[in-house]
Amino acid sequence: MNQKQSKPNVILIVVDQMRADALSINRSDDLVVTPTMDMMASMGYNFENAYSPVPSCVPARAALLTGMDQEKSGRVGYEDEVPWNYTNTLPQTFKDLGYQTECIGKMHVYPNRKRMGFDHVLLHDGYLHVDRKYNKAYGETFEHSSDYLDWIKQELGSDADIIDDGANCNSWDVRPFELPEKYHPTNWIVSESIRFLKRRDPSVPFFLKMSFEKPHAPLNPPKYFYDLYMDKLGDVSDLHIGNWEELEEKIPSLYAKRGKIPADAQKRMLAAYYGLITHIDNQLSRFLTAVEEFDLLENTIFWFVSDHGDQLGEHYLFRKGYPYQGSIKIPAFIFDPGNLIAGTKKSVTQLVKIQDVFPSLVELATGEKVETDGKSVRQLLFGEFAGWRNEFHGEHSLGEDSSQYILTDEWKFIWFPVKDEYQLFHMTEDPEEKCNLIAETKYTSLVNEFKAKLARILQEREEGFVRDGQLCQVPLEHIVSTLKRGR
């Protein structure tokens, strides 16, 4: 340990749109290749039931950086260009505690260059439609709000682009990366993170957020990693189809949120998605080697987390924003190679939320306790479960598919307020959510309990979810209007 530095360094590794079962250690088969992540999770503390309650980029990242639940942050769904006016943030807290704070990669805040408490940000938010609109301010356009794209143009010329192949930020279509691998955004984030290790102030601890924009589309892994899964993947027809899905007969567009695509397209999509994850894993190995070479490994606490998951065609759904496990369940683990935490519980099965990252990292690294809606997981790492949550409320504004849900250790209850429809899944017996039990009379009492509980949670919401103590159908325009407001 550096003699001038008493507190450990903290590295928060964030990936975008990686579902929990895309981490090999969370699977029962050997399809996904993530040896570096598996090593980190198995040597550290793996959270087997980690969730993103509002599963899309903007609300999930607000929860991560502020520790706030959606009712307080105002982020109940995805909406661009709503100002981030939060002052109590994870990087600001570390900064106040004497840390040098750095973010490399994706922020997805507004304004784009708002630092949220970081001393310095090297920004690449990925391919965002909103940044490519014709009426964007000069400094907020895609060409001028990405440090990665600036670097690409410096390396390859002013006409260089990474999206001229037609791949889209929300498409299930696949285009293996056409440039040499060193120009891939995943490599750039790791290269710049290694450069940060070189230029940091060695007299103070650092908090580094390495924020990858992958495996979020465009689905453009380097060809090596794409080919790996085209060879490994067999039958891809099992899409966890249950007794409740409605399949639209029309052929889905490349940007569709639902529908059934041909089996060969499904295979290419999965090969590219898993290929992007294995590529990240490969680059994380490179980064950990650098951390060790700088003699920082045993004085650094790492936390790996995804902002949300991806449906990947399950239940005929794509992308995220849904109340199902593909969207809301995420990989999360702590890697503590120096055994600084010295916990005793390596596999944690309790319900953990993305809001818990903020208070957990601060307490684990500094001993300081901060007040947020999230909770520090320290007690769980020592096998102390008293007072821990056994359920949580989640939601997402998504047009007619807008949802409210309650997840417990055993059950998931879902309400779609625009359609006024309900679902009930017995998660311990039906983890793939194939059998909707809402119509079975033996569960009527349980359903009524969930309805009453959800009505109490939503009683004061401006959308008008509750009338006379009962859940009531809500017009779509009531839900859309709330997305325009931040807190």
Residue spans for each PLM region:
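Formylglycine-dependent sulfatase
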Residues: 1-412, 422, 431-452, 474, ...
